[in-house]
């Protein structure tokens, strides 16, 4: 029986990779998504991120370009894409996100046209089909940088 928490991470930038390493280190089953196939190929092949030199991504962190793979059946889903891509990513992922899903938003910023926070943007997009009324959506924020989290120093999640 596998008691690992399954976590999908939307976004393979420095935040996504730093959190993937940290969550994996703490015993969770992690899958990272990017919409860019070449990026996923490079991460899978090298097990490193170009902006986090010298930090190795464990072999058991999974990578995919498929939204259904990263979102379906996960205990927790993290949104770690740039703020400019939050709305489009939420819209694209919506069919694969079950109602009641725990979602953690780690993107920072305000949407210029609506002045919504990223968490509000995610909720707005997910609510458009009327089937995501019970999504548990939280924001994770604080005075940290992806590079610090990637170093795994003084952090326990």
Protein language model features and the residues they cover:
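NAD(P)+-binding Rossmann beta1-loop-alpha1 motif at the extreme N-terminus of oxidoreductases
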Residues: 1-56, 62-65, 92
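Short, well-ordered alpha-helix to beta-strand connector turns
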Residues: 27, 60-61, 74, 100
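Conserved short-loop catalytic and cofactor-binding motifs
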Residues: 31, 58, 106, 110
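Residues in flexible loops and secondary-structure boundaries
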Residues: 41, 51, 60, 71-72, ...
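Short, solvent-exposed coil/turn segments
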Residues: 56-57, 142
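A generic secondary-structure signal marking the coil-to-beta-strand transition
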Residues: 59-60, 136
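Rossmann-like NAD(P)(H) cofactor-binding subdomain of soluble oxidoreductases
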Residues: 67, 72, 76-152
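Conserved small/polar residues in nucleotide/adenosyl-binding loops
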Residues: 155-157
């Amino acid at each position: 029986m596998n008691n690992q928490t399954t976590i999908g991470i939307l976004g393979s930038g420095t935040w996504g990779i730093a959190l993937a390493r940290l969550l994996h280190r703490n015993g969770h089953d992690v899958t990272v998504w990017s919409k860019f196939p070449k990026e996923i190929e490079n991460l899978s092949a090298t097990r490193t991120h170009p902006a986090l030199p010298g930090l190795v991504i464990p072999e058991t962190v999974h990578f995919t370009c498929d939204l259904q793979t990263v979102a379906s059946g996960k205990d927790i889903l993290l949104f770690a894409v740039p703020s400019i891509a939050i709305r489009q990513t939420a819209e694209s992922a919506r069919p694969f996100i079950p109602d009641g899903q725990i979602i953690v938003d780690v993107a920072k910023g305000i949407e210029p046209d609506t002045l919504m926070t990223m968490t509000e943007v995610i909720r707005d997009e997910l609510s458009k089909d009327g089937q995501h009324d019970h999504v548990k959506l939280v924001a994770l924020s604080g005075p940290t940088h992806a590079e610090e989290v990637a170093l795994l120093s003084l952090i326990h999640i």
